[in-house]
Amino acid sequence: MLYKYTKKYAKDAEVINFGCFVDEDENYTYVEIALLIGMLINNHIVDFVVTGCSSGQGMMLACNSMPGVLCGYVPTAKDAYLFAQINNGNVVSLPLGEEYTYTGEKNLEETIQALFSEPFGGGYPKSEAKRKIADAKKLKEIKAKSQIDFEMFLNKLDPDMVKKAKYKMHNSFNLIDDKQCN
């Protein structure tokens, strides 16, 4: 559902599904997927990621632990719209364990639709747009200064976890070698 609605509403974007699949030989934790997301964002392989976990909170926290990643928790259409307009981050996390029966699926679709309804970073409310845009820029500057370089970060992690995330990245995006990514 996540891929279907992202593809439907992110009309001007190339949408790639690199999620976890039932037929994969390897299982990935949300922490490992967050590391993969950090690699994809920091290597400019993707500009934006829509992801999640059971609660959405764990993935949001894991993603925000990655240098260069600004992830918002967007359980509702209003949250998605406000994150896109005010915070202008590069990842959103949804609570995928919510009851995606008819009403849950409807909420998921409305959330994705609201996320991509306008270009990101326009500010909200519009009367406060200039201030909101400046605040989002300051937040990104503070985050960048408070974290280490992504390559240094990778070198401090468990090499097996990094290797596992790189393996998924290479397979998902048909990358040739490590020269294309950290």
List each model region and its residues:
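A short, small-residue-rich loop immediately preceding and capping a beta-strand
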Residues: 46-52, 71
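A short beta-strand-loop structural module common to alpha/beta enzyme folds
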Residues: 12-27
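Short, acidic/turn-prone active-site loops that include or flank metal/cofactor-
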Residues: 20-21, 74-80, 96-99
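Gly/Ser/Thr-rich loops at beta-strand to alpha-helix junctions
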Residues: 53-58, 99
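Glycine-rich phosphate/diphosphate-binding loop of Rossmann-like nucleotide-binding domains
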Residues: 1-14
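Short Gly/Thr/Asp-enriched flexible loops that form oxyanion-binding sites at enzyme active sites
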Residues: 58-71, 75-79
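C-terminal binding/interaction regions
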Residues: 81-181
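Short, structured active-site "lid" loops
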Residues: 30-48
